[in-house]
A protein has these predicted regions:
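ATP-dependent carboxylate-amine ligase
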Residues: 1-122
């Protein structure tokens, strides 16, 4: 949770310059039995940030989604393969996207694929 807090704080320090900030939040897998508490805590960081919309992927992140302020909610994605088509319709040139989650969620594959096909949006 410390690394995700730092990531959100650093993301918030980047100037929006009239553009939008999107956060794709995947499960943090290595947290043990108190995982739900830590996922809920992340929503507080999101709510206190300048992130415009948050999309979540994974059982734990999806359960915490309801704690994100309504105006900051993107949606729950139940299939990792729906990410690129969904986000490609939303993100405009110059918008900012942060993807964060455990390696086990394979989110790195999304960012690799997204950068290959849509690097103009980052």
């Amino acid at each position: 949770p410390i690394s995700i807090k730092s990531a959100i704080e650093n993301f918030s320090n980047i100037s929006k310059n009239g553009k939008k900030k999107y956060f794709f939040f995947g499960d943090m897998m290595e947290l043990g039995k108190k995982s739900h508490i830590y996922h809920k805590k992340v929503t507080k960081f999101i709510n206190n940030s300048d992130i415009d919309k948050t999309f979540v992927y994974g059982k734990r992140s999806s359960a915490a989604f309801k704690f994100i302020k309504k105006n900051k909610r993107g949606e729950i994605l139940d299939n990792i393969h729906r990410f690129n088509p969904k986000i490609s319709k939303i993100i405009k040139n110059g918008d900012l996207l942060m993807i964060k989650g455990s390696h086990a969620t394979k989110l790195h594959k999304i960012s690799e694929n997204y950068l290959r096909g849509n690097n103009h949006a980052l």
